[in-house]
Amino acid sequence: MFNERIFSVGITKFQINNFDNQTLCKQVEYFCTNPHNKTVNKRDMGLDNPHLIELNKVILQQSQLILNGLTSNPNVEVYLQRVWGNHNVNENICSPHVHRESFLSAVYYPKSTDGRIQFYSPFTDAILSHVPVIADKYHEFNSSQHTVYPKTGWLILFPANLLHVVLPSKEERHSIVYDIGVKLI
């Protein structure tokens, strides 16, 4: 086992209890109504959407906390680049992907009972490709992936360039996804 950690990849996840998830689900469904238009830009929910004001505030606050933990530069701040909704669009988000041109991504789940998002390590496959891994317990040094099982009301923030995939779900799932940038002030 290694005795020192030199690099790390973090995510933030927590439960939010005071949002009107029913209204947020209706908003997601409204912006995902065309079954032939599954591209992100066609599902844009609008950063100025009045139903997203409180969620936008939480996303900005949590994103700024992450940025502040990475740098002591007082001249940078986060901003919301775009927001879109997903409503059981399993076929479009089941390929591993990253969110290019962004600092962070955030996903809020106004409804999720069997949702799964899987993150892939940017490091471990390089070393594990030389070792047949049989492990009694998986940990950060011998795992090439990490699965999160979000429930209704969960918010997850992660580096936008972290490779991830949303695994298919059998039950109804709604999510609101943000890309977050950084700018000089």
What is the role of each PLM region?
Residues 88-157, 182:
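Catalytic core of non-heme Fe(II) oxygenases with the double-stranded beta-helix
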Residues 1-76, 84-86, 93:
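Non-heme Fe(II)/2-oxoglutarate
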Residues 94-97, 164-170:
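Short beta-strand His + acidic residue motifs that chelate non-heme Fe in jelly-roll/DSBH
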Residues 2-4, 156, 165-166:
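Karyopherin-beta/Importin-beta family HEAT-repeat alpha-solenoid scaffold
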Residues 179-185:
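Short peripheral tails and domain-boundary helices/loops at the edges of structured domains
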